[in-house]
Amino acid sequence: MGRKVHPIGFRLGIIKDWSAKWHASDKGFAECLTEDLKLRKAIAKKYVDAAISQVDIERQSNKVTVSVRTARPGIVIGRGGQRVDEMRHFLEELIGKKVQLNIVEISQAELDAFLVARSVAEQIERRVAYRRAMKQAIFRSMQAGAKGIKVCASGRLGGVEIARREVMHEGRVPLHTLRADIDYGCTRAHTALGDIGIKVWVYRGDILPEAKEQSEPEVTEMAAVMADAPAAAVAEAKVADTVAKPKRVTKKAEAEASAEEKPKRAAKKAENITKEEE
């Protein structure tokens, strides 16, 4: 049975970047990974209603830079940046290191796969029909400029006893095209009858490599002179070039020339003999 590859992991290093940028030794790797999990869980728990899509972590010696991508930066920042300072102090106490907190705003939440999945999950938790929630999410994403979207819901849909899976899609979602900018997000909707899993793929267009600047061909000194010189000067240069380089005489040409000279020599010799007899 085939397995689907994670769309973001499949494109890492090509058009996608890592969410954690740091290097650690074999002994310190587990510690850094545990700190990353603590940071992400603490931020997600503290800002449930902030529409946080992704948390990027970068480490430099004893300093940790945390970038939070959110569609509602006002909730995270607070009045006069008060909540940012509180969150930074909380994270520093959590891991025992200096933390720099950056807030990155998401301009279009309808093109972010995780935020689309969260909106569908929240509607299902409020007892909205799952088909209606999925159709609304697809419509809003396509209106926002998405080239294609696919939404998958799995679980006890509609309260039935047997779990099933339902998929809705619109437009193109080329999963095997590496240059295709496909965002992927998944989450859960917690209901009284159990959890319902939501997966979303959003195709936002192709990311083409930057065109390399073509270097101009090297112009030699002779070519520059020929380009600047008038037609008469060019003709003189060609004549001088032919004069300076004499034609090479082949053996065949020499034989033909000697054959032509033989009759002339015989006629001249006969003429000399006639003059002597007279």
Swiss-Prot record:
Gene3D superfamilies: 3.30.300.20, Ribosomal protein S3, C-terminal domain. It holds the Pfam family Ribosomal_S3_C. InterPro entries: KH_dom, KH_dom-like_a/b, KH_dom_type_2, KH_sf_prok-type, Ribosomal_S3_C_sf, Ribosomal_uS3_bac-typ, Ribosomal_uS3_C, Ribosomal_uS3_CS. Residues 39-107 form the KH type-2 domain. Keywords: Ribonucleoprotein, Ribosomal protein, RNA-binding, rRNA-binding. Residues 251-278 have a biased composition (Basic and acidic residues). GO terms for cellular component: cytosolic small ribosomal subunit. GO terms for biological process: translation. PROSITE patterns: KH_TYPE_2 (PS50823), RIBOSOMAL_S3 (PS00548). Residues 244-278 are annotated as: Disordered. GO terms for molecular function: mRNA binding; rRNA binding; structural constituent of ribosome. Binds the lower part of the 30S subunit head. Binds mRNA in the 70S ribosome, positioning it for translation. PANTHER family: 30S/40S RIBOSOMAL PROTEIN S3 (PTHR11760), SMALL RIBOSOMAL SUBUNIT PROTEIN US3C (PTHR11760:SF19). Belongs to the universal ribosomal protein uS3 family. Part of the 30S ribosomal subunit. Forms a tight complex with proteins S10 and S14. This is Small ribosomal subunit protein uS3. The lineage of its organism: Bacteria, Bacillati, Chloroflexota, Dehalococcoidia, Dehalococcoidales.
